[in-house]
Amino acid sequence: MTDLSTLNVIRQQAADALLSYRISEGLFGLEALMRECPDQQLSNALENIRDSYTQMLHFLSQGGHDEERADIQDRLVRQALHTLDSAARLIRLSRREDLYAHAHYQLFLLGGQDAAPYVLQQWDAQQGTAERYETQDLLFDLLWTTPLWDQRQTASWFEFISRQDTLVQQHLVGAVILSACEYMDAEKLIFLSLIADSEQPEVRALSLTGLVLLLLKYEPRLSFYPALLTAFEGRKLADELSLLQRELILMQESPKASQAIAQEMAGIDFVHSTPQQVEERIRATMKRYRALIVEGVDIDFHKATLLHSSQFLRRISHWWAPFDESRPFLQELFIRKDGDMAEGLRQMFQHSADCSVNRYAICEAMLSHSDVTSIDKQLTQLWESIEANLTDAIPQQVYFRSVVQNMARFFAHSPLAQQTESLFASDTCLPRHAFLRPLLNRQTMMQTCQMLIHFHREAEAFPLLQQLSRQESVSAEMLRLMGRCQQQMGQWQKAVSFFTQADLLDENDTWTLQQLNVCYERLQRHAERLDVLQRLEVQAPDDLDLSLQLADCLAHLGRADEALNLLYKVELYRPEDVTVLTTIAHSALRLGRTDVARKYMQKRLSLSAPLQSEETLMAARVQLVIGRWREALQLYAPTPDETFEAEREPLTALGFPEKDFALLRDMRQQLREKK
């Protein structure tokens, strides 16, 4: 008996052959699969497909001509794929080696070969009782493990699910999504397209998300099912697809963001850093953490301890169950005597986008504690960690966020995760898929590109912008985004070109001028940078930070007196601004005015405010160049090694010898070892 993994390879190879119109090869693979599946109905289907294809080949080889042969090919491929998936499913059920087969077998024990009448009868009889949750789980398993549908079943299940309450609808729609994920079923996808018109926003968001992800998974097959593509015709989905795209990108960024936060925390040098520096690093990391949560990034995606330890989530159907506080096992939590605590829990869930599986796991963890004080403390901590997740979020966005986060957790952490392919394995950038482009408007495309750029995926955003520029008239906004892509890819000259064009279309746009300033500074084109800074100064004559940049630019152009006069002007308005004092010292040093540099550095160090990270480096450079090595070493000692090594370039620009930098490195290392 061939093992399931080998049979899955045979199935995939046969499917690939059929999709490439290598029909004889695909039928050969299907025949190999059928040897493990002695089902007479499927054997007859295979024989009919083979006979039809043989007759077609014979007819054409004899000089026959059939203008509909392409349609016949598509029909035969479609029938062969249907037979292939049906055979693979029956083999899987017969082996009883995984959760899918086990769920189907439990239904068989209850209702025989067709358990639907039994389960539906139980459902009707148990309305309004606590037992209905168990039957609801059976309904889920029934839909999850159901064979491929025909049109009659699509209509029947649509009618049944549509008349259930919103929570039940969500649960059963989830079962249909999971079933279609196991095996491609065009009728189930048509069902999802129909139920996506629901007036219930939660059901609509779930259905549309599942449908889009399934279409992405089965994109190579879509040309054989034209009815699936026409199901979208005339429907205005751009706004909802934009919300979905946003959440899909955020979900992709979640693992990277979570890892980055962990690395930031691990990178804090508690041994060599001062308490103020440690506090500064921790505060900066936590600020970034909260900013990511507000943005919608699922920062705790990989922290799944509660999910893995949950007894409730050991059942597959519970991963797709919308949160329902009426479930019997939750009653102890929500009807405790201390009603304030229960109300607080409701408020937490009501005003957060925390997905259903998280809520169930949180409640289960709380129920394991008998100490109400402990529960209150946990509740406060949990609320503080997730309350920002919905700040300024619109309701529709909340629904899509909860759905995407829930589904992502299912395919990453559920007991079924290792037994089925994730719906997130496909490319989830919607504009890259031709069949979805007609549904996306310009705004959706631009927002997608903005998000990709924001998360440093500019290499993905730029081709989309190029494609959009060929389809529509080029705007200043589009050019700005294209310039930003080139900027982030380090193509500074190309970035200047795009920003310059944007400036021509939308003259004196502040953001565009700021980016040109950055590019010219990087390219050391100081004359052009000065022109841009002067244009910005006209817009904001009292901007002292802009004056600092102007002084820096003038210094590079050798206009030392003008640069220092500007810095002195800034000092008049900010006499004790630590950044201003350090900048004056640093600029004076670069201009060769060591006396001025020494004066302003002493003035800065006399202030009680602790040195910030960049300020510490500037102060160390000044101390070093004016010959105060010991003071410079004290400043350099707590900095990370990579930060110190990066100081080579600015110090060299200030005239500090390369060999002296090597000495400085060894002296710093000795000082760190002594500490």
Language model region names:
Residues 23-24, 182, 458, 492, ...:
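TPR-repeat structural position
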Residues 327-506, 511, 518:
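Alpha-solenoid helical-repeat scaffolds
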